[in-house]
Structures are given as C-alpha cells and as structure tokens.
C-alpha cells in the first residue's frame, strides 16, 4: 500500500513537472526587438509608423506554437545603420531598417561573427538613384558638380551617399584621392559646417539633400539620379530569428505593408506625424511620401535593388570596410515578403513588375479638370489646409500662388516636377525654362534649364522670376 502510494505520488509529481514544462514552453515570452532610423524618413513604413500606430500588434500570431505566447516588443532608434548593425550582431536587436550600403555591411558583419542576416524587403527607393544628393552652401556660386574639382566635399563614410559620390566623381574622370578632398562627416555636423563655410559641399542620404535646402542654408546641385545608380532603404532580420519565428517576420512585414498603404492614402497626415516624431519638416516628408515623390515606396525586390546591394558590397571592399563578399542569392531572401503579400491579399508579382511612382489622382485646383499629364504638375501646401493643392502646370500653380498671397494666406511649400528626371522638387529651389509656346518646365539645375531653353527657343527663370512671368501672362 505504501509502495503503491509512493509510486502514485512520483507519477503525480512527474506529471506536474511535465505540465509545468509544457506550460512554460507554450507561454514563452518572445522578444521582438526592432532597430529604426526615424530621421531617415523613407524608412517610416518599416519602423516609425508601425511603432506610433501600433500596427504590429494587429498581425502577431496567437495560434499554433504562439497560442499562449507573450510578446515583448522593443524599439530602439538610431541615426545611422552602423550602430544598429552592431547591436544586431551582438544579439540585442532582431530587425533593423537601413540603406543598401549599411545593409550590405550588416550582412558582412554577421558573416564575420559566424552568423547570418537576411535582407527581407525594400521599403523605399529609386532605381535611378534619387534620395541621395549633393548640396552646397546657399551663398555658393557653384551650380554643378563639375565646379567642385579641388574642393572639399564631406559625406557620411561608407554610406549609400558615399557610394553615390564616388560614382559621381568617377563620371567626371576625377581621381577621388587627388582631384577632390573627400572627408567623413555625419549630417548633424555637416549642417553646421555648411552654414559656417567650412566645407564646399556635402553629399548625403535621405532626407538631408532636401532638408538642408528647405531650411535655407544649402542648395542642391546634384541628384543621385544623375549617377543612374539604384538606391534604397530596406529591412533586415537575424537569420536564426527568422528560422525560429517565421510567422513573426511575416507579421512585421504585413505591418509594413499597412503602413505603406496609409502613407499612400493620406501622405499629408502622416508627413505631419513623421515631423512630430523626428523634427524633419512635414513639407520635406511630403517630398518623399506624397504622390510622384522623390522615391517610390516599394516593398518588392526589383532586380535593380538586388544590383544595388551587389554594388554596395564591391564599394565597401574598395573602401576596405569589408574583406569578403556575400552570396546575394541567400542574403536577399524574398520568401517572407512574398508570404506577407499573400496574407494581405496582394499580388507580389504585379508589384514586382510595376515601376510607377506613387500615383497622383487629382483634379486641377484651379480648373477642376482631372490631371492626366503629370510632366508639368505643381503643388501648393497652404498652411491650415489638410491637403496639398494640385495643378496641371506650373503656370496655373504660380498664378494661384499670387492670389493666395494677395489674400494673406501663409504658404508652407510649393512643389514642382522636374521635367527631365520626373522627381519632385521644392519649387523655390528649382530652375524654370519656357518652350516656344511659353510653357514652363522645371529643372533641378540651371544648366539643365539653359540647355532646354536653347533647344526650345525659350528663356530661363529662377523661382521668383518664373512666378512673376506666370502672373504677367495670366
């Protein structure tokens, strides 16, 4: 009897231990640690908006192995990709958002540590290279890159902007070690250096080639699209984490997809939110997230973006920041974004084949007619109005601008589309040229406008003169 009771007690205790073990396993607390770059505003759909709007919670799994799981979601913000990578390699972060160059370095750093990371999605980019750019002090007489020979140009070292600068210098036929003085400088230092006249130019990534000019102390003289080198920002994950929790990776990407959809539907609203969190002006955020923006928010792995990663690896080796290559076929892993698209009832293949900018579906604020030709579109953001006004032409926008100013309305920003590259420009930073019929076309550079005007028999105007011209011919 005693022996039987003892055996029964042992069996009961064993059952309790097993039940306790099973309960602890099913009630596991799973960390989801995400590194963001909030001020790198084209990463918003991969971090800032997911965090601020609580989107991740909507998609986290609560069935199967996750039935009783608890989630510990952690967020940490960085100003660049390098320190973010350091914490990912150290096991302190599971996900990270960064550009092609730091992303490539992330993969190399993981390999060096005997681990692996995966580039799982694109967030925003340009197959031509827009987003990166070069600016000069606003008082500088420099109008083009060709005038910077022998000058000092600063750039965040080993960044995607550094890669653009090296390609731009090479296209001029210059030796980067002899014909220009390239120095390492992060944007927070470069802004002050530009204002103090300590550097002749600064090359940088999103959003600084637009932000500095919008603040009035710099002028953009080179857009990354002139280098015709694809650039993007995207999301990475620790491979071991992805293998253990693939459903969480898909959940993160589904949240990113929703953030992207929200940006497309209400760019002004979310440009304001990004401004509130980052201090980057909403008017600059709209340059990227508004329709026909500087970059395209595109989560699909287009061949050009795969190429950008390969180019980044080669350049990092040239800069002696990497001593090995990466197998792009394994480092870039699109299985998770494909699964996220499918779970969101979206067609990944259709998105992969689409190269269009964020579309503009609007009527001309002056005529009320639908805008169908986007090559001369201009926009006005009036303070106090929740939506940006769109116009089919710069002439129409500038005429409306004059009327708004007469009414005492405060203007937040005026935008125009570059006629050659198609990128969105701050109109007060652009150059304009007329054709034989007097229609205004916008350009980033004075030289581009002069070339167009010469070919068309027209004239060149800066923003002030272009607005006066539009009012005069009304």
Region annotations inferred by a language model:
Residues 20-24:
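N-terminal signal peptide c-region/cleavage motif recognized by signal peptidases
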Residues 316-361:
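Conserved C-terminal helix/tail region of periplasmic/extracytoplasmic solute-binding proteins
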Residues 364-367:
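Short cysteine-rich clusters marking metal-coordination/redox-active sites
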Residues 111, 183, 188-277, 395, ...:
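Pocket-lining segment of extracytoplasmic ligand-binding domains
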Residues 28-175, 181-184, 200, 229:
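Short, glycine-/small- and polar/acidic-enriched structural segments
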Residues 40-41, 244-323:
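Secondary-structure end/capping motifs
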Residues 69, 152, 156-167, 172, ...:
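Ligand-binding clefts/hinges and TM-proximal coupling segments of bilobed small-molecule sensing domains
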Residues 50, 131-141, 231-247, 433-434:
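A bilobed periplasmic-binding-protein/Venus flytrap-type ligand-binding module shared by bacterial periplasmic
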């Amino acid at each position: 009897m005693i022996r039987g009771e003892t055996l029964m007690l042992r069996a009961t205790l064993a059952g309790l231990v097993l039940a306790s073990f099973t309960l602890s396993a099913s009630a596991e607390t799973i960390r989801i640690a995400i590194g963001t770059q909030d001020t790198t505003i084209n990463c918003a759909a991969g971090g800032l908006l997911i965090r601020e709007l609580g989107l991740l919670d909507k998609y986290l799994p609560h069935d199967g192995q996750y039935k009783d799981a608890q989630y510990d979601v952690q967020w940490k913000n960085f100003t660049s990709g390098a320190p973010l990578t350091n914490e990912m390699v150290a096991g302190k972060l599971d996900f990270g958002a960064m550009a092609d160059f730091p992303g490539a370095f992330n993969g190399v750093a993981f390999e060096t540590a005997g681990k692996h990371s995966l580039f799982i999605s694109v967030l925003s980019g340009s197959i031509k290279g827009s987003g990166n750019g070069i600016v000069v002090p606003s008082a500088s007489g420099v109008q083009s890159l060709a005038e910077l020979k022998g000058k000092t140009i600063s750039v965040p070292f080993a960044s995607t902007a550094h890669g653009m600068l090296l390609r731009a210098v090479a296209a001029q036929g210059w030796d980067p070690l002899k014909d220009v003085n390239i120095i390492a400088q992060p944007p927070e230092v470069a802004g002050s250096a530009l204002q103090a006249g300590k550097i002749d130019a600064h090359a940088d990534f999103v959003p600084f080639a637009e932000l500095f000019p919008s603040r009035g102390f710099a002028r953009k003289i080179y857009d990354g699209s002139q280098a015709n080198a694809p650039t993007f920002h995207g999301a990475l994950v620790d491979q071991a984490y992805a293998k253990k929790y693939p459903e969480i990776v898909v959940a993160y990407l589904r949240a990113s997809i929703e953030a992207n959809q929200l940006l497309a539907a209400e760019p002004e609203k979310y440009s304001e939110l990004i401004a509130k969190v980052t201090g980057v002006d909403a008017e600059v955020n709209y340059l990227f997230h508004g329709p026909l923006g500087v970059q395209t928010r595109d989560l699909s792995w287009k061949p050009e973006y795969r190429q950008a990663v390969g180019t980044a690896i080669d350049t990092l080796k040239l800069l002696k920041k990497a001593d090995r290559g990466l197998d792009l076929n394994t480092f870039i892993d699109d299985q998770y974004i494909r699964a996220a698209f499918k779970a969101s009832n979206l067609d990944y293949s259709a998105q992969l084949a689409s190269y269009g900018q964020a579309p503009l579906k609007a009527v001309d604020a002056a005529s009320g007619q639908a805008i169908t030709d986007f090559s001369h579109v201009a926009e006005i953001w009036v303070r106090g109005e929740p939506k940006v006004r769109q116009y089919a032409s710069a002439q129409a926008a500038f005429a409306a601008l004059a009327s708004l100013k007469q009414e005492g309305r405060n203007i937040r920003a005026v935008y125009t589309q570059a006629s050659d590259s198609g990128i969105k420009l701050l109109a007060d930073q652009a150059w304009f040229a007329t054709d034989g019929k007097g229609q205004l076309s916008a350009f980033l550079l004075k030289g581009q406008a002069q070339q167009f005007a010469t070919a068309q028999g027209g004239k060149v105007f800066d923003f002030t003169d272009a607005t006066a011209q539009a009012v005069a011919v009304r």
